[in-house]
Structure formats: C-alpha cells, structure tokens
C-alpha cells in the first residue's frame, strides 16, 4: 500500500518538489530499483483474458514467467538509455507488517473466489481483474529473477527487510542517484530522490526531490513521518476521521502524533458531553511509535559497506536459463541483444565495456563468495515463454 493518498497530497501541497522527465534524462545515472514492486507489476501486466480462460506466461513446469519477461525488458530499456540499474529485493518483512499482510492475504482469497465465479459466468474482463488481484510472488519466482538479473550482469541486493528502505539508504550514501518504485513510503524512509512511472517508454517519469518536498511542506523529517503514519501506512491502522489534508493541518498545529492524540481526546470528550458521536476513532492497536521507529531507523545494510560490482553478462548461461529452462524464444533474446548493439556500431561487447567500465553486481554479504565467481562473457537478451490457462 505504501502511504495512502500521499502522491495526490504532495501534488496539491508541495507541487514544486515534482519534475516530469523522459527516460533519456537519466542516462549515465545509477538507479536503485524496487524489484519486488516491479515483479508484481509485470505479473499483472502479462496476464490476458482468453475466450474462456485467463492466460499467463509460464515455463514448461507451470511456473509463471511474466515477471522475468518484464524485468528482462526493463533492464534492456535501462541499458539502451545508458542507465545503470541496481535491483533490490525485499527480505523478511517486519513483524509490524503482519497485520497488513494478513489483510492482503484475505483479499487475495476473496479475489480467487470472485475469479472462479466470473469464469463460470463467462465474464472474462471481471475474471481478469479479479485474477490480477490474486497475484503473489513465490520463492521460486524470486530466485529465478535474481538468477536472470545476475546472469545479465546487474547488481542484485537482497535487503534485510524492506527494499524501499535499502534503496533509500543507498541513495543517501551516494551509491545510487534515485530510488525507482511506486511505493511512496520510499520518501518516508528518506530517499533523496524518488522516481515513479517506469511503465511505458513514451510516458514521462515523475521525479520527486525529498529536500524540496520537506522545504515546501515546512515540516521536519520526524513530522513528515508522523504525517505519513496518519495518512495510513503498512505498519499500523490509522485514525478514522483523519485524511491527508486534516493530518497535515493537525501536524502543523500540534507538531506530533502525541500532540494530536491529546487534541483528539479533548474533541471526542466534548462531543460526548453533547451526546454526539466521536469525530475521530483511534484504533485499539495504534502502533504509531513502533511504526515511527521502523521508518526512522529501518533494518538495512549500510550503504557505505556495500560493494557494487557490474559484471559483463554471461550470455551462454543466460540463454541456457531463459530458453531451455524458462521457455523463452531464442529470437526474442537475440532481438534483445540487437537492441543494445544498434546503439554502438562496434557491437554489443564494446558498448557494455564502455558502459560498465570496471563492473557491478551487488552481493549480499552472506553469499559473497558464491556469487563473486560469475562467468565473464559478453552480452545481453530479451523475453518470451509458454502460456498457462486458468
């Protein structure tokens, strides 16, 4: 979920923190990409409605591959435009997120029932919509994505916890230019630059500058965190009766959630005297202090301690993995290689050598030995796969 309605709120209250830019603006930049968020997007985008069934891309064993298609093409798109992607995956979710995860699981189960009902009724558009809401990422899908990206020579980080928090840490450490994610809580984790909208080639990308945002809102970082918690985040329930606009006014006046809670208590007590319903409803488990702590001091690997290494793509093993194991069409991969080669008459290899210089793959400290011995060949590919009917 990220932070509820934060994007719209910032457009209204801090419009000067936004810029809309085309992809080629970021040439030469290193961008930290929220891989888990991107995988969900790609899995949803690669589903389609047949006459009587929902169709998904899969390998010969039935494992979904839409996320690989998307990550592969997105990586090629970045490389074509001179952008260095660093892919960051979620680690173990914080305990504070268990309530939100349980809520999402319930919604997915409900969507599964609605999918089956829509299929029985022959309403394929409704079936597709509901099936998209059942999307989950399995451990196999995550492992496949990591393997493919590493074979492509890209840096891969497995965060200890939240990917957005790890990206924000890398950005503050100067290891990357920006965090690319649709989750607005990257700002709550204090990423200096947030990029949203890497969906199509032709649409502009939103760049949000944290310092400009804070300056225009006239808030401290701690107050902004409290604002985000009041808007609604993944770690606690929110106070009913307080939306983003009201939250902002209250933070400006009372400075913190503690001050606002005192105000809420007085307002509700006064209304009770007048036999009126309470204006605000504070949840019984309003874990704002724990949520605040998680945003301000998240579990991350220190940016200064991470070694980033870009390697040349291992084309032979990449082709073997995508074609033989995952059912990609060889022509799709070769076409992907050509997309890069077109940018440099001298060919794909020299372009990558010029682009990567002395190389980047990010290695989790616990797996550094195993992953450091990557084969050093020369190239890079693109999509395809089987189809699975639901």
Curated annotation (Swiss-Prot):
Q: How is the cofactor bound?
A: Binds 2 magnesium ions per subunit. They probably participate in the reaction catalyzed by the enzyme. May bind an additional third magnesium ion after substrate binding.
Origin, by domain of life? Eukaryota
Give the binding site residues for Mg(2+) 2: 183, 185, 234
Identify the keywords attached in UniProt to this record, alphabetized: DNA damage, DNA repair, DNA replication, Endonuclease, Exonuclease, Hydrolase, Magnesium, Metal-binding, Mitochondrion, Nuclease, Nucleus, Phosphoprotein
Quote a single Gene Ontology cellular component term. nucleolus
Report residue spans for region: Interaction with PCNA.
348-356
GO biological process entries = base-excision repair; DNA replication, removal of RNA primer
Q: Where is this region: N-domain?
A: 1-108
What subcellular compartments does it reside in?
Nucleus, Nucleolus; Nucleus, Nucleoplasm; Mitochondrion
Sum up the protein's function in the record's words: Structure-specific nuclease with 5'-flap endonuclease and 5'-3' exonuclease activities involved in DNA replication and repair. During DNA replication, cleaves the 5'-overhanging flap structure that is generated by displacement synthesis when DNA polymerase encounters the 5'-end of a downstream Okazaki fragment. It enters the flap from the 5'-end and then tracks to cleave the flap base, leaving a nick for ligation. Also involved in the long patch base excision repair (LP-BER) pathway, by cleaving within the apurinic/apyrimidinic (AP) site-terminated flap.
| Quaternary structure and partners | Interacts with PCNA. Three molecules of FEN1 bind to one PCNA trimer with each molecule binding to one PCNA monomer. PCNA stimulates the nuclease activity without altering cleavage specificity.
The name of this protein is Flap endonuclease 1-2
Which source organism?
Paramecium tetraurelia
The encoding gene is FEN1-2
């Amino acid at each position: 979920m990220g932070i509820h309605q934060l994007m719209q709120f910032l457009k209204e209250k801090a419009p000067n923190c936004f810029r809309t830019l085309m992809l080629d603006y970021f040439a030469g930049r290193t961008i930290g990409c929220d891989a888990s968020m991107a995988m969900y997007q790609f899995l949803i985008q690669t589903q389609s409605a047949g006459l009587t069934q929902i169709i998904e891309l899969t390998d010969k064993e039935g494992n979904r591959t839409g996320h690989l298609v998307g990550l592969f093409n997105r990586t090629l798109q970045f490389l074509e435009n001179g952008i260095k992607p660093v892919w960051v995956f979620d680690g173990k979710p914080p305990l504070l997120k268990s309530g939100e995860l349980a809520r999402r699981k319930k919604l997915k189960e409900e969507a599964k029932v609605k999918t089956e009902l829509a299929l029985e009724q022959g309403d394929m558009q409704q079936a597709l919509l509901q099936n998209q809401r059942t999307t989950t990422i399995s451990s196999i899908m995550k492992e496949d994505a990591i393997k493919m990206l590493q074979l492509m020579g890209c840096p891969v980080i497995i965060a200890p916890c939240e990917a957005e928090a790890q990206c924000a840490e890398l950005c503050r450490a100067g290891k990357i230019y920006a965090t690319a994610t649709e989750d607005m809580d990257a700002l709550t984790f204090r990423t200096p630059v947030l990029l949203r909208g890497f969906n199509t080639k032709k649409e502009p990308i939103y760049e949000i500058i944290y310092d400009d945002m804070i300056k225009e809102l006239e808030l401290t970082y701690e107050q902004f965190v409290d604002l985000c918690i009041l808007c609604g985040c993944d770690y606690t329930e929110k106070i009913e009766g307080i939306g983003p606009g009201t939250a902002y006014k209250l933070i400006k006046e009372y400075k913190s959630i503690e001050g606002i809670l005192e105000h809420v208590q007085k307002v509700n007590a006064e209304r009770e005297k007048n036999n009126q319903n309470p204006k605000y409803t504070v949840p019984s488990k309003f874990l704002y202090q724990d949520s605040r702590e998680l945003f301000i001091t998240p579990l991350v690997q220190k940016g200064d301690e991470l070694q980033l290494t870009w390697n040349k793509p291992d084309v032979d093993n990449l082709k073997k993995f995508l074609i033989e194991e995952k059912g990609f069409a060889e022509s799709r991969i070769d076409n992907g290689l050509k997309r890069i080669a077109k940018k440099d008459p001298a060919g794909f290899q020299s372009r990558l050598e010029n682009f990567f210089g002395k190389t980047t793959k990010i290695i989790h400290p616990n797996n550094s030995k195993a992953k450091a011995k990557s084969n050093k060949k020369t190239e890079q590919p693109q999509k395809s796969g089987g189809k699975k009917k639901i």
